[in-house]
Swiss-Prot record:
Organism: Sulfurovum sp. (strain NBC37-1)
The protein's name: Crossover junction endodeoxyribonuclease RuvC
Residues the record lists as binding Mg(2+) 2: 66
Alphabetical keyword list: Cytoplasm, DNA damage, DNA recombination, DNA repair, DNA-binding, Endonuclease, Hydrolase, Magnesium, Metal-binding, Nuclease
Source taxonomy: Bacteria, Pseudomonadati, Campylobacterota, Epsilonproteobacteria, Campylobacterales
UniProt: Mg(2+) 1 binding residues: 7, 139
């Protein structure tokens, strides 16, 4: 089973694909989609095309996305919501369903502490996946954490 974890942002999208063979999980691929265009509609197209490439390059069984969290800047929330809507539609068209996790759920699942910092989450993700090198930006480790969180739920469903 291949799980795609997504950390959506207004300028970057972190993603991670984990494979679970029923007993253990392994990292297939992780990276960052950087939005380079300036106009909002072009940014949305760039994001959807990028996720389409990822979905078509891998046999994705399930997708997990970080839920939108409250931000102090209403413009940022609106922009992120538009990205999120386009991303959601693409995933629904290709996969048929996706799962959402709040930042609190992800932090708690990976570190045991819902108030963990991004650095603490990154440390635990690298430890769980056996990665020694530094991973930057943290959008990538956030996507890994989202995929790990979903994988924990999948394992509970299988019991």
């Amino acid at each position: 089973m291949n799980i795609l974890g997504i950390d959506p942002g207004s300028r970057n999208l972190g993603y991670c694909i984990l494979h679970w063979d029923g007993k253990k999980f392994s990292l297939v691929e992780a990276g960052l989609l950087k939005i380079k265009t300036k106009e909002l509609q072009e940014q949305i197209v760039e994001l959807v095309e990028g996720i389409d490439i990822i979905l078509k390059a891998h046999q994705i069984d399930e997708v997990a996305i970080e839920d939108i969290f409250f931000a102090y800047n209403p413009q940022s929330v609106l922009k992120l919501a538009q990205f999120r809507g386009a991303l959601s539609l693409k995933i629904l068209q290709e996969i048929g369903y996706f799962y959402e996790y709040t930042p609190l759920q992800v932090k708690k699942a990976v570190t045991g502490n819902g108030k963990a910092t991004k650095e603490q989450v990154a440390f635990m993700v690298k430890r769980l996946l056996g990665i020694k090198k530094e991973i930057k930006p943290l959008d990538i480790t956030d996507a890994m954490a989202i995929a790990i969180t979903h994988l924990q739920r999948v394992k509970m469903r299988k019991k």
